[in-house]
Amino acid sequence: MGSLSTILRHPDELYPLLKLKLAITKAQKQIPLEPHLAFCYSILHKVSKSFSLVIQQLGTELRNAVCVFYLILRALDTVEDDTSVPVEIKVPILIAFHRHIYDGDWHFSCGTKEYKLLMDQFHHVSAAFLKLEKGYQEAIEDITKRMGAGMAKFICKEVETIDDYDEYCHYAAGLVGLGLSKIFIASELEILTPDWKQISNSTGLFLQKTNIIKDYLEDINERPKSRMFWPREIWGKYVDKLEDFKNEEKATKAVQCLNEMVTNALNHVEDCLKSLASLRDPAIFQSCAIPQIVAIGTLALCYNNVQVFRGVVRLRRGLIAKVIDRTKTMDDVYGAFYDFSCMLQTKVDNNDPNAMKTLNRLETIKKFCKENGGLHKRKSYVNDETQSKAIFVVMFVLLLAIVVVYLKANQCK
């Protein structure tokens, strides 16, 4: 649930953590009895506990469609990510993946751990897919076809320019945003806005760029071959080879490049907020809003942080629990983006080559949040110091009281 020392430093996160633990337990008990769907929800919980949780509030039909959609794209991503699979085998599979989802006998063994289980037992996902309504099937097939073709293209092509970077992120995640929008429309719970394609694509790019940034070390250490998604147009300003950022003597250059990558990702924030504001169904809204808030929080944590090149950088579980607990309305979203933008702003070094660009971007985001949200109506996600101290005092007093009662009881004996 979280280490005791972390909870003591952030006692305001204890209650959300307990609620999250109960919600996860409840979700695990709600796995459908039907074998194919039972496998889908069970493996979804293994590959992404957070996504498994945030879709629980969706209606059954829509939840099943989103679950199957996620697993199909996760399987596609597993094929792409497995660098041990020869290119001549991998590319045809990616291109034909949209046809494999209709084949109940198809599977391809690759990946590791839970991802290998997903691939080995893919017939369960295919069977669940074939039971979805036609509108869901068509949306999922279309996105799978386009994503597979895009991934195949970048198996044989390096990410050289920022345009390449945006194109790759479109194939890897922008299409996920478009696909979810199509699924929501098919459910008749949402309607299209005139700019739905652009803003849906941006939500995917924002999430994908965040993952590419935080996963630098994991991707560069991939064997037998590194995965490299940072665009040469950015990293080439700082080093000769992308893997050089692992070297301690390149720490300053590494952090400067990291900061430019974060600043690039921030370009998508306004579209993300517009996309969330367009959603009408509360459950759909919450399932889409939580990952976006976690992304801006992750960027704030990664910015100017050399640890990205040394190990794992991720938000505290307690902070994620707080985000899940507090995200109910657009005011909450605007507040979260405002708070994390302020947090990121305090980390900007004026000597950084992109400092001015970063600060301007953050001011624009904060202004957008102020103009569109009631920031005074919500609790802060990152600045609850007074409340935290009060909770800490209460916890300390309660703990002391328990110890005193225990000691007195022993004395009586």
Swiss-Prot record:
It is a multi-pass membrane protein. InterPro entries: Isoprenoid_synthase_dom_sf, Squ/phyt_synthse, Squal_synth-like, Trans_IPPS_euk-type, Trans_IPPS_HH. The chain crosses the membrane at residues 283-303, 390-410. It comes from the Eukaryota. Its cofactor is Mg(2+); Mn(2+). Mostly expressed in hypocotyls, leaves and cotyledons, and, to a lower extent, in stems. Keywords: Acetylation, Endoplasmic reticulum, Magnesium, Manganese, Membrane, Transmembrane, Transmembrane helix. One of its GO terms (cellular component) is endoplasmic reticulum membrane. It holds the Pfam family SQS_PSY. The modification N-acetylglycine is found at residue 2. It is found in: Endoplasmic reticulum membrane. This is Inactive squalene synthase 2. The lineage of its organism: Eukaryota, Viridiplantae, Streptophyta, Embryophyta, Tracheophyta. The gene is SQS2.
